[in-house]
Swiss-Prot record:
This is Putative pyruvate, phosphate dikinase regulatory protein. Its EC number is 2.7.11.32, 2.7.4.27. Belongs to the pyruvate, phosphate/water dikinase regulatory protein family. PDRP subfamily. It catalyses: N(tele)-phospho-L-histidyl/L-threonyl-[pyruvate, phosphate dikinase] + ADP = N(tele)-phospho-L-histidyl/O-phospho-L-threonyl-[pyruvate, phosphate dikinase] + AMP + H(+); N(tele)-phospho-L-histidyl/O-phospho-L-threonyl-[pyruvate, phosphate dikinase] + phosphate + H(+) = N(tele)-phospho-L-histidyl/L-threonyl-[pyruvate, phosphate dikinase] + diphosphate. It comes from the Bacteria. ADP binds at G147, L148, S149, R150, T151, S152, K153, T154. One of its GO terms (molecular function) is ATP binding. Bifunctional serine/threonine kinase and phosphorylase involved in the regulation of the pyruvate, phosphate dikinase (PPDK) by catalyzing its phosphorylation/dephosphorylation. The keyword Membrane does not apply.
Length: 266
C-alpha cells in the first residue's frame, strides 16, 4: 500500500485533491493522508517523524513559504522520500511570464473576500431549501434542479453552492406533483436530471439494502414504480420546457460543469 501525504502550509485541500486524483488511478493500492498547516521548520521536523516508519510513501506538497518548502525538500532527499512540489514550478513560470514577484501568501485562495461569503451564503441557501416543501427560494435561486429520487440532486446542489451558486432541488413524486411557482420562473435556470432506468433501480436497491428497508419500501425500487415515476417526470419536464442532463454514470463534478457552462459561470 502506497501512502501519499498531502502536505500544505494552509488547509491542504489543493494538495489532497491532487493526491486523490493520483491515488484513484491505483484503486485499493494507494491511500491519501492530509497534513495541513506545516508552516515552520519545526513543523517539517514533526512531519518527518510522523512518516519515518512508513514503508512506501511519497509527499505531494503545496507549501508556499520558500524556506519551509526548501527545507522539506532537503529532508526528503536525505530520507530518500519522493516529493512533488505542486505549486512551486507553476508559480515560478507565472512569475517569469508576468515579470512579477509572487506574494507567497499561504491560503491566499481561501481569504475571506466577497467570493468566500458568497459561497457560504449559497451553502446556507442549499441546506435551507433542500428537498423541502418551502418553495419561496425558487425565485432567488440561481439554479433549480428537478428530478426523481436518487438522481444526485442534493449533492449536486451542495457542490454548486461551494462554487457560490444558489441551487434548490425539486423532487419529482407522482403523488405530490410540483409547485406552481416552478412554471413562473425563468426556465433557463431549471435543469431536469434524467437517468437510465436500470441504473436507478440498482441505486435504489442498494439504498434499501443499506438501510435494511422492507415491506412497503420495496415498491420504491420496483420496475413498475420506477416506470410510473419516469412517465410522470417526462410529462413534467416537457411541460416546463427546461434543459435536461443525463446523469447516468456521470460524476457530480461533470454535471456541475455542464450546468455552469450553460449558465456562463466560470
Amino acid at each position: 500500500m502506497l501512502t501519499i501525504f498531502a502536505v500544505s502550509d494552509s488547509i491542504g485541500e489543493t494538495a489532497q485533491q491532487v493526491a486523490m486524483a493520483a491515488a484513484s488511478q491505483f484503486k485499493d493500492n494507494a491511500e491519501v493522508k492530509r497534513i495541513p498547516y506545516v508552516k515552520s521548520l519545526e513543523d517539517v521536523e514533526d512531519l518527518m517523524k510522523t512518516i519515518e516508519d512508513c514503508e512506501a510513501c511519497m509527499i505531494v506538497s503545496t507549501i508556499i513559504t520558500v524556506n519551509v518548502r526548501e527545507y522539506l525538500t532537503q529532508k526528503c532527499i536525505e530520507k530518500n522520500i519522493n516529493i512533488i512540489n505542486v505549486l512551486g514550478p507553476i508559480i515560478n513560470v507565472a512569475s517569469t511570464i508576468l515579470n512579477k514577484y509572487p506574494d507567497y501568501n499561504p491560503g491566499a485562495m481561501w481569504n475571506t473576500d466577497e467570493t468566500y461569503y458568497k459561497r457560504i451564503e449559497a451553502m446556507e441557501f442549499a441546506m435551507q431549501y433542500d428537498d423541502s416543501k418551502d418553495y419561496r427560494g425558487l425565485k432567488n435561486a440561481d439554479v433549480v434542479l428537478v428530478g426523481l429520487s436518487r438522481t444526485s440532486k442534493t449533492p449536486l446542489c451542495m457542490y454548486l453552492a461551494n462554487k457560490g451558486i444558489k441551487a434548490i432541488n425539486i423532487p419529482l413524486v407522482p403523488e405530490v406533483g410540483v409547485p406552481e411557482e416552478l412554471y413562473e420562473i425563468d426556465k433557463k435556470k431549471i435543469f431536469g436530471l434524467t437517468i437510465n432506468p436500470l441504473q436507478l433501480i440498482e441505486i435504489r436497491k442498494r439504498r434499501l439494502d443499506k438501510f435494511h428497508r422492507i415491506s412497503a419500501d420495496i415498491e420504491y425500487a420496483s420496475d413498475s414504480r420506477i416506470l410510473e415515476e419516469f412517465e410522470f417526470a417526462d410529462k413534467i419536464l416537457r411541460k416546463i420546457g427546461c434543459r435536461t442532463i443525463d446523469v447516468t454514470q456521470r460524476a457530480i463534478e461533470d454535471t456541475a460543469l455542464i450546468i455552469m457552462e450553460k449558465l456562463g459561470v466560470k
